[in-house]
Amino acid sequence: MNADLTIAEVRLTPVLVSDPPLLNTQGVHQPYTARLIVEIVTAGGVTGLGETYGDGKYLELAAPMASALRGRPVSDLNGLFTLADTVQVDSARVEDSVDVGGLRGVQTADKLRLSVVSAFEVACLDALGKVQGLPVHALLGHKVRDRVEYSAYLFYRWAEHPGGAGEGDDWDEATDPAGIVAQARRFAGDYGFRSFKLKGGVYEPDREIAAVRALAEAFPGAPLRLDPNGAWSVPTSLRVAEELGEVLEYLEDPTSGTPGMAHVAREAGVPLATNMCVTTFPEIPEAFTTGAVQIVLSDHHYWGGLRRTRELAAVCRTFGVGVSMHSNTHLGISLAAMTHVAATVPNLEHACDSHYPWQGEDVLTRRLAFHEGCVEVSDAPGLGVELDSERLAALHERWLEDDGTMRDRDDAAAMRKADPGWTTPAVPRW
């Protein structure tokens, strides 16, 4: 193998992948969601893979960064951030509101840049690992565990998209406690998951409380989480915490904003987790000093990559704050990257989130598998995954044929297919 680490080519391929009608507080997932697949090719002929959000605002940043990467070594990981700082972000693309593309806190220009940098960093690490014959986790200091545990990600959902749009799947409707328990039983049976997270903020709190209680009865002692994406007021959050405190592992983002979370944390008897009020390093001081969160759900996509995820974990360890991982709709490249970095974090004490079982399509030659709710950490060079070029081309063709409706995530617009009068709800909803 030619060991020349110089970047000779960068390929950016946006794709549209099928997505089920999963409900959240802002609406429902569209029939397809956009992802960006990054291929970095070295002068030595080695290709590294990365993946991130595929909405237009990310593609606009990825293109100039890709051009500037040519001629640099894949080992220059620090240079990625210097390069990103030179890329201008269209102010019209930055909204001072919660980012609907995964409900991951307020959107900022830096977060947009980091969400693109992360894909390039993962691709560089994948290529570097292949050249050196080392798995990505070894480039990060080596694994401290042989497998990474994930949690079943439960959603209220419809049986199909309005009008039968999209590719469809074989999952049933789940809009009540019985439906959620049935969904959880299938996740446990098919993948061996031993902990369960319910995406809330969809129905009135009492209905979601009933669903969590039904899960506790069906799976005695299993770790349970409830995430309403900041849809509740402080009083409602406190009431839910009081009613479910004995069965919840943690309550995730019950209310919006660090001050509200701090209020709930002071009075509730249940730990609070977040992927909304701590999403950048500058947000840490207020959240940690006020005791607003007890667990940070990291996400290498918008934190800026795998090395920054490890930096975040170290800060959390310093302050005695727990750490786990958030998930958005993603494919196997992202899951492989998540698994490698999670394997290197000593203080990872909670099962990570993953949408992956909901995605029936992928760009890999072989899907990653869950056994007993865990993904084995690959010791193969790089990420240990292989790109299926034909499948990538087919999903890219779908993106090309789309009229633009699906290229940017908009859960409220998708909900209007079922409810024409729907608008993004103001928070708190309850």
Question: Which sequence ranges carry the predicted segments?
Answer:
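Metal-dependent enolase-superfamily TIM-barrel catalytic cores that perform enediolate-based chemistry
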Residues: 141-268
